[in-house]
């Protein structure tokens, strides 16, 4: 089979390898699509945490089960998506339902081979069946939508609240829709790339600003009636954290969802103290996979604005380049693994 491998920083190679054999408790999935996440790009550059070279990347995927043993034989022929988290199940974090914090965490696409290939093995407990009518292309966004829903709920976003978002990549655009689904309103979104701001407008965000320092704060100063109760930081850029701290209302909440490890964030702690702000981090999909599948199947979430550029694995260099440069109106590149 063909598989894309990250061998070292900025070294992506298309390889030929044997189809993997599923271990007990695993299924073999014939992959259909995989979208490129911002974390994949950081991994590609060599500036990420908890990864292993060489490895096949990819964790936002869809496919069809072709082999499953034991009590999971009924999965064969089913279209599925899956959680990237492979937890031990027995450490103190796992036993209280927090597998993302597992002491021996493994992740598909980071520490074990992921979905930028024709086939992949996955623990059967990680799989979620897809209903008829939900396309495999759209289903690549189940995992990131679950991430967005989990973040909005961890921030306890409720009906009637005003929310600002920094960053309009895939997660930022899904956050905008997750906020709406919870009955709150995205009043403004900050994003430097014109096409991504246009995508946000197409999804119903009424106001956008660029990503330069001070633009979000300046907007709030001009429109105090739109001062956000919550700011969701989805860009991962350090300056956006300080911007969020200054823009949110006193007593408000800041959600840290995007992050990068290349640069450290610098902020003025007195803003947090004097304004009595709450900062809440969120990582991973939590237990929102089922809801994400239902929402996509019902057409309640638009992913066409996200899936902007399709590539085959053979064109991986261009796919990664376009995604890294956010070029040609890119919001999210994805691989058609059946091409």
UniProtKB/Swiss-Prot annotation:
- Associated pathway: Metabolic intermediate biosynthesis; 2-deoxystreptamine biosynthesis; 2-deoxystreptamine from D-glucose 6-phosphate: step 3/4; Antibiotic biosynthesis; paromomycin biosynthesis
Q: Which UniProt keywords apply?
A: Metal-binding, NAD, NADP, Oxidoreductase, Zinc
- Which domain of life does the UniProt lineage start with? Bacteria
Give the range the annotation lists for the signal sequence.
none
Pfam families documented for this protein: ADH_N, ADH_zinc_N
Enumerate the catalysed reactions.
2-deoxy-scyllo-inosamine + NADP(+) = 3-amino-2,3-dideoxy-scyllo-inosose + NADPH + H(+); 2-deoxy-scyllo-inosamine + NAD(+) = 3-amino-2,3-dideoxy-scyllo-inosose + NADH + H(+)
Which GO molecular function entries does the Swiss-Prot or TrEMBL record give?
A: oxidoreductase activity; zinc ion binding
- The protein's required cofactors: Zn(2+)
Cofactor detail note: Binds 2 Zn(2+) ions per subunit.
Q: Give the protein's recorded name.
A: 2-deoxy-scyllo-inosamine dehydrogenase
Look up and give the organism this protein is from.
Streptomyces paromomycinus
Which gene holds the coding sequence for this protein?
A: parE
């Amino acid at each position: 089979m063909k598989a894309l491998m990250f061998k070292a920083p900025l070294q992506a190679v298309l390889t030929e390898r044997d189809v993997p054999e599923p271990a007990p408790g695993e299924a073999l999935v014939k992959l259909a699509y995989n979208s490129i996440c911002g974390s994949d790009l950081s991994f590609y550059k060599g500036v990420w945490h908890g990864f292993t070279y060489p490895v096949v990347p990819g964790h936002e995927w869809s496919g069809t089960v072709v082999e499953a043993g034991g009590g999971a034989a009924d999965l064969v022929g089913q279209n599925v998506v899956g959680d990237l988290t492979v937890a031990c199940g027995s450490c103190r974090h796992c036993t209280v339902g927090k597998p993302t914090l597992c002491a021996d965490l493994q992740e598909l696409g980071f520490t074990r081979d992921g979905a930028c290939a024709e086939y992949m093995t996955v623990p059967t407990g990680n799989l979620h069946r897809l209903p008829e009518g939900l396309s495999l292309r759209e289903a690549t966004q189940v995992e990131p939508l679950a991430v967005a829903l989990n973040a909005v709920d961890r921030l306890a976003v409720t009906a009637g609240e005003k929310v600002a978002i920094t960053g309009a990549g895939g997660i930022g655009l899904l956050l905008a829709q997750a906020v709406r689904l919870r009955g709150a309103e995205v009043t403004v979104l900050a994003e430097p790339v014109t096409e991504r701001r246009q995508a946000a407008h197409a999804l119903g965000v009424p106001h956008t600003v660029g990503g330069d320092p001070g633009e979000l704060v300046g907007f709030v100063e001009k429109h105090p009636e739109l001062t956000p109760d919550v700011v969701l930081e989805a860009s991962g850029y350090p300056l956006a954290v300080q911007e969020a701290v200054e823009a949110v209302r006193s007593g408000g909440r800041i959600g840290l969802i995007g992050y990068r490890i290349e640069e450290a964030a610098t902020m003025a702690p007195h803003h947090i103290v004097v304004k009595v702000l709450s900062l809440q981090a969120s990582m991973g999909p939590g237990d929102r996979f089922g809801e994400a599948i239902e929402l996509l199947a019902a057409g309640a979430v638009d992913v066409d604005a996200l899936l902007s550029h399709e590539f085959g694995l053979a064109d991986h260099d261009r796919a990664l380049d376009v995604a890294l440069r956010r070029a040609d109106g890119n919001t999210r590149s994805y691989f058609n693994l059946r091409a």
